[in-house]
């Protein structure tokens, strides 16, 4: 099976609308490196095709990495600005040495994978499944980002997330002793959606589990809420740590999508954080 056929199979299996029709010339889902007109010897799914992931894919005999995020550290994966960059040169050399093709799968997997007669967001369904929270989803069940869980404290929830997701640690903003039943996994907290997230939290969420967190917007709001006795907390997990389970979940449906028995495995890009505590 050619790599191009793997890619076409996955795209055909998924939905085709992510805030509008997914168009081949504008989608994030592009081949970021390598040829597609060669036989696929194996597939590795991951969130970020880091240098270590590339090495592990090669060691497993895989020549196709399907990643969720960009390869070269910027939106759109532009490389014109990287002329002379030593890290870019070294990563490019590693890719060439290992004979790896990298395809980004972002828009299609978010737009939906078939499950129980409907399309569900493959990334956030993967997170819900990893956490064992499928039965706790409220709101939009096709994009599980709102949950009502058995009551716990924010600190206990943070410890659960660290263990279940295999993290090095995490951070809590607000009241670590706050009682938590309702949890929101918001979209990016990088300015654009911060006010909307603050409004949603005020309307009935005890705790945020965030991909990013902006210190001067949502973090300040949660801290003030806690200091004013409103029992709010935010657990800062990290973008890749939140979305990576969806790429592991992909292994469940990938064989159906490509209709062939190609060796496939998941390699975690892993928690990027190392924590130094007082």
Give the positions of each predicted feature:
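Active-site catalytic microenvironments in core metabolic enzymes, especially phosphate/sugar-handling
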Residues: 1-278
């Amino acid at each position: 099976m050619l790599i191009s056929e793997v890619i076409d199979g996955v795209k055909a299996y998924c939905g085709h609308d992510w805030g509008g029709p997914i168009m081949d010339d504008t989608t994030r889902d592009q081949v970021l490196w390598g040829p597609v007109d060669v036989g696929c010897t194996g597939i590795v799914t991951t969130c970020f095709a880091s240098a270590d992931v590339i090495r592990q894919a090669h060691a497993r005999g895989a020549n196709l990495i399907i990643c969720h995020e960009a390869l070269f550290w910027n939106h759109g994966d532009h490389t014109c600005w990287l002329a002379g960059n030593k890290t870019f040169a070294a990563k490019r050399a590693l890719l060439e040495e290992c004979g790896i093709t990298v395809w980004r799968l972002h828009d299609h997997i978010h737009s939906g994978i078939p499950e129980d007669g409907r399309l569900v967001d493959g990334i956030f369904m993967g997170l819900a499944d990893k956490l064992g929270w499928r039965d706790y989803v409220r709101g939009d069940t096709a994009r599980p980002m709102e949950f009502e869980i058995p009551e716990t404290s924010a600190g206990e929830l943070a410890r659960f997330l660290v263990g279940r997701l295999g993290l090095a640690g995490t951070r809590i903003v607000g009241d670590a002793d706050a009682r938590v039943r309702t949890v929101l996994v918001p979209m990016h907290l990088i300015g654009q959606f911060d006010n909307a997230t603050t409004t949603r939290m005020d309307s009935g969420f005890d705790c945020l589990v965030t991909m990013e967190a902006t210190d001067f917007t949502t973090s300040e709001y949660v801290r003030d809420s806690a200091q004013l006795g409103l029992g709010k907390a935010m657990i800062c997990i990290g973008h890749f740590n939140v979305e990576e389970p969806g790429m592991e979940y992909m292994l469940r449906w990938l064989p159906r999508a490509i209709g062939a028995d190609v060796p496939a495995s998941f390699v975690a890009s892993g928690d990027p954080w190392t924590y130094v505590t007082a």
